[in-house]
Amino acid sequence: MNITIVSVGKLKEKYLKQGIDEYKKRLNAYAKVSIIEVADEKAPETMSEAEMKEVKRKEGERILSSIAPDAFVITLEIEGKMLGSEQLAKKLDELATYGKSKVVFVIGGSLGISQDVQRRSDLALSFSKMTFPHQLMRLVLIEQVYRSFRINRGEPYHK
């Protein structure tokens, strides 16, 4: 399986990079994993609704250009469906079983994702009703993907 994480913005925090690199290394035994960072749009502190929509549209274009046409797309959204670790593992297992070998997870920028990206999504996934920094979500997401593969293989890790 090919797992791609498309995320808006550049990861700056060293401790997050180290954690992500560790899980990416662990995942190599199960899947090919790549992380694509698309540029975030420069935006002033205060914006009108139209300006926010334009920022999301531009970031959305960059996200969509990074997604293969045959990929199964999972967007991370506050209003998405909440799944437990076992349910996410089952979903990834089902995708592999039914020939969906390319799975793309999308983490939007600070304003969220555009409507075009939402329309391209096959599954809107929520980790919580709370808001998290999108850089931190990369680490949380890649850990959950790793956990999913361990669950699906019946290997110890999941508790």
From Swiss-Prot:
The keyword rRNA processing applies. The gene is rlmH. InterPro entries: Alpha/beta_knot_MTases (IPR029028), RlmH-like (IPR003742), tRNA_m1G_MTases_N (IPR029026). It is an enzyme of class 2 (transferase). It catalyses: pseudouridine(1915) in 23S rRNA + S-adenosyl-L-methionine = N(3)-methylpseudouridine(1915) in 23S rRNA + S-adenosyl-L-homocysteine + H(+). Its EC number is 2.1.1.177. Pfam families: SPOUT_MTase. GO terms for molecular function: rRNA (pseudouridine-N3-)-methyltransferase activity. Specifically methylates the pseudouridine at position 1915 (m3Psi1915) in 23S rRNA. It comes from Oceanobacillus iheyensis (strain DSM 14371 / CIP 107618 / JCM 11309 / KCTC 3954 / HTE831). S-adenosyl-L-methionine binds at L76, G108, F127, S128, K129, M130, T131, F132. This is Ribosomal RNA large subunit methyltransferase H. Belongs to the RNA methyltransferase RlmH family. It is found in: Cytoplasm. One of its GO terms (cellular component) is cytoplasm. Homodimer. Its main location: cytoplasm. Keywords: Cytoplasm, Methyltransferase, rRNA processing, S-adenosyl-L-methionine, Transferase. Coiled coil: none annotated. HAMAP family: 23SrRNA_methyltr_H.
